[in-house]
From Swiss-Prot:
It comes from Burkholderia ambifaria (strain MC40-6). This is Homoserine kinase. It is an enzyme of class 2 (transferase). Belongs to the pseudomonas-type ThrB family. Pfam families: APH (PF01636). GO terms for molecular function: ATP binding; homoserine kinase activity. Coiled coil: none annotated.
Length: 332
């Protein structure tokens, strides 16, 4: 979400001719993140986000945009892609795929409490179930094959201890992914990047009995078809940790996981491999952050994340992982 590709006023004016969104009132780059170029766009018709996709190809993009439309049609609050005048959900800007989506209400909660975790857990389970009949398929592009391809490029930059952990965990995950239990885990479209800054909350309406309302999930451009438990693990590793140490906050994790399984109970195989999947979720982001830190791309506004954060989380998950909470009756 850093700005890698600049958009001038004349570029924007030409681009907006393909949309019926009124006159542009404001336009500014979003500096956070490291993958795509994102801009807040305000017009006389409303508020939107313009994204230029720096890595995803025109062949890959329909999976993500159509998934967002599919989830929205099933009641999951996500950004809605805006069709162009030819009906397409994206076009080319500076030779790169680009799209406009609706901007969700609310703000990110960077210090979540129990109620935030409950809201996220329930909606993540609803997202998984809503995606069961989604017709397109795209694997998680940052899964085991990506790790195997890119870890060798990273190891020259790290310490001996880090190299041992990188290579040892890669071997552990490769064996896990090859197991019959892994093959049996429930799967489908996953967000794969449901961090605190990819969820918005708004104030709940009076009389609802809640202090917060989930405004929506966004930034689906790491989404892919994967094991649902991986998506849960990625989410817990961000929403339910002490950011300074990586230690799991058991109360928040318990709240999120219990809320999730009121919608979709965990299977026996998922319970057996919760620790493995928490490790996989931590490893995925440690590897990608190491790659972005040591092998960055040029960008106008680039703020690489600290790789050490997910190294600490991975070491913590290897040392200790509580069991999944007991199953509750599902409700849809």
């Amino acid at each position: 979400m850093a700005v890698f590709t600049a958009v001038s006023d004349s570029d924007l004016a030409q681009w907006m001719r393909h949309y019926e969104l009124g006159d542009v009132l404001a336009f500014r780059g979003i500096p956070s993140g490291i993958e795509n170029s994102n801009f807040f766009l305000t017009t006389t018709r409303g508020e939107y986000v313009l994204t230029i996709f720096e890595k995803l190809t025109a062949e890959q993009l329909p999976f993500y945009l159509d998934l967002m439309r599919h989830l929205a049609s099933h009641g999951v609050p996500v950004p809605d892609p805006i069709p162009r005048d030819d009906g397409a959900l994206f076009g080319l800007l500076h030779g790169k795929p680009a799209a406009i989506v609706t901007k969700l209400d609310g703000a990110a909660e960077l210090a979540p409490g129990i109620e935030h975790c409950i809201e996220v857990g329930q909606m993540l389970a609803r997202l998984h179930l809503a995606g069961r009949d989604y017709a397109r398929y795209q694997p998680n592009l940052r899964s085991l094959p990506w790790w195997q391809e890119n870890v060798p490029a990273i190891v020259p930059f790290v310490s001996d201890a880090q190299r041992a952990l990188l290579e040892g965990e890669l071997a552990h995950q490769a064996a896990f992914f090859a197991s019959d239990d892994y093959a049996a885990l429930p799967s489908g479209p996953c967000h794969c990047d449901l961090f605190r800054d990819n969820v918005l909350f708004a104030h709940a309406a009076p009389g609802t009995g809640h202090d917060v309302r989930l405004g929506g999930f966004f930034d689906f451009y790491f989404a892919g078809c994967d094991k649902w438990l991986f998506d849960v693990a990625v989410t817990v590793n961000d929403w339910c940790v002490d950011l300074a140490t990586g230690v799991l906050d058991v109360a928040r994790a318990d709240a999120l996981l219990r809320a999730y399984q009121t919608v979709r109970p965990f299977t026996a195989a998922e319970r057996r491999h919760w620790s493995d999947m928490l490790r996989a979720g931590a490893y995925r982001f440690w590897v990608s952050r190491l790659y972005d830190f040591y092998l960055p791309r040029a960008a106008e506004m680039l703020k690489p994340h600290d790789p050490g954060h997910f190294e600490r989380i991975l070491r913590e998950r290897i040392a200790h992982t509580p069991a999944l909470p007991e199953t509750h009756t599902a409700c849809n």
